[in-house]
Amino acid sequence: MDQEAVGNIVLLAIVTLISVVQNGFFAHKVEHESKTHNGRSFQRTGTLAFERVYTANQNCVDAYPTFLVMLWSAGLLCSQVPAAFAGLMYLFVRQKYFVGYLGERTQSTPGYIFGKRIILFLFAMSLAGILNYFFIALFGSDFENYIKTVTTTISPLLLIP
């Protein structure tokens, strides 16, 4: 792979690798909680604490494929930097959701809502990239610079709760 191609995806790859480490952390928490209360073997049922850790992990795993598709679609079709920034924000929010779910379930709600907003932003970026492709193919008009400017300007607004 040449340097330019790698430069176009390196931030997305970094965010993806960080998300893999986070998944490992979540799985370790489930395993640790299972072994703490069930001895040496892993069991899917147990104490309330284990049920919370297991459910929080399962909820994060369920949303993970959608996150990866939106991250890479937005980064490849629109702009890498805002997509990677939104991806990092999503990982922080997912951590907040996971930790919040271990306490009161209402503590996980802000992370869940914020995560949905970030996924929607990544979806909008992907859609803008697809529309730009068709504008180029059909009309010869390239709006890529405008789209990159708008997404780069809007992405810091994701920090507002």
UniProtKB/Swiss-Prot annotation:
The keyword Methyltransferase does not apply. It is a multi-pass membrane protein. It is found in: Nucleus membrane; Endoplasmic reticulum membrane. The chain crosses the membrane at residues 9-30, 53-77, 81-102, 116-128. Residues 108-115 dip into the membrane without crossing it. Keywords: Endoplasmic reticulum, Leukotriene biosynthesis, Membrane, Nucleus, Transmembrane, Transmembrane helix. One of its GO terms (cellular component) is nuclear membrane. Its main location: nucleus. Gene3D superfamilies: Membrane associated eicosanoid/glutathione metabolism-like domain. PANTHER family: ARACHIDONATE 5-LIPOXYGENASE-ACTIVATING PROTEIN (PTHR10250:SF2), MICROSOMAL GLUTATHIONE S-TRANSFERASE (PTHR10250). Required for leukotriene biosynthesis by ALOX5 (5-lipoxygenase). Anchors ALOX5 to the membrane. Binds arachidonic acid, and could play an essential role in the transfer of arachidonic acid to ALOX5. Binds to MK-886, a compound that blocks the biosynthesis of leukotrienes. Belongs to the MAPEG family. The C-terminal part after residue 140 is mostly disordered. Homotrimer. Interacts with LTC4S and ALOX5. This is Arachidonate 5-lipoxygenase-activating protein. It comes from Bos taurus. The lineage of its organism: Eukaryota, Metazoa, Chordata, Craniata, Vertebrata.
